[in-house]
Amino acid sequence: IVPEPFYPNYHTFITTAGGVIHPLHTKPEEGYFYADRARIEACITPKTKAIMITNPGNPTGTCLTEEQMKMLLDVAVEHDLYLVADEVYREFTYDGEPLHSFGKFDYGQENLILIDSVSKRFSACGARIGCLISRNRDFMANALKYCQARLSVATLDQIAAAALYSVGPEYFEQVRQEYKRRRDTVVRKLHEIPGVICECPRGAFYLMAALPVDDAEKFQLWLLQEFEDHGDTVMFSAGEPFYATPGKGCNEIRIAYVLKQEDLERAMDLLALGIRKYNETH
C-alpha cells in the first residue's frame, strides 16, 4: 500500500521484486492527506505485505504528526505488516513542525523498516550513500544477502559521509529557513494564478499543484518547444508518472523549490504567463 502520488522509483523497485502497488488515493484540494485509518485499512487484503510511505513526502511535501505516525505503526502491528518509512527528508519541516522518526516508538520495531540517506540531508546526492534500519533480524539477514552481492560504496565517499554527521544543528536551521522562504514564495505565486490548486506543504522541498490545463505533460512540451518570454521558459515534472492509477495526475505538476529566490519568482511568473497563453490556443 503506497499513498499516491509517490516517488516514481518505488514503482520500479516494487514491481521488479514481484510486488504489486495498491495505491492509496489522495486529492490535491486536501493537501494529499492520506493518514486516515479507515481508508488505509480498506486497502488491506490477505495479500498485503507492507505499507510504504515517505515522511516528509516526495512529491507532495506532506508531513505526518506524531499521532498519525503512531496510527500507521498501530495498523502495521495489528495487521502484521511491514511499515517501510522513507525518512530522507526528516530534517526539512517548517512552520514549527517538530522532527519525528518512526524509530522513536518503543513498540512495533519488528514491523518497521527505516530508509535514510545523506543525499538530501546534506545535499550530497553524488555520494550515493544510504541505509536500511530495522530490528527485524530476518529482514536484515535477507538485506545483507543483497548487500553482499554488490561492491561497496567508494571508501572516500564513506569517509566524507561520516564527517558530515558532525555538522551542528545550526546548519539545518539555516537550511530550513531558506527552504521555507522559497516555499512561501512559490505557494504565494501559485495562489495568484487563477484555477491553480495548491495546498501549502509542511516539509521536504517539493510541492504538487493542479493546473487549469488539459494535460500537464503536453503543456510542459509546449513550454519547452513553443513558449518563451525574453528568451526564458520554465520546466517542471509532470504529475502523471507519480501515480500508479492510470489517468490520475494528468493535470498536476511537481515543483522542486531548490532555486534561488529571484529565480523562483521568475519561474512562477513564466508559469502564469504560460498557462494563460496555452489556454488561449488549446
Regions found by a protein language model. Name each.
Residues 1-282:
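PLP-dependent class I/II
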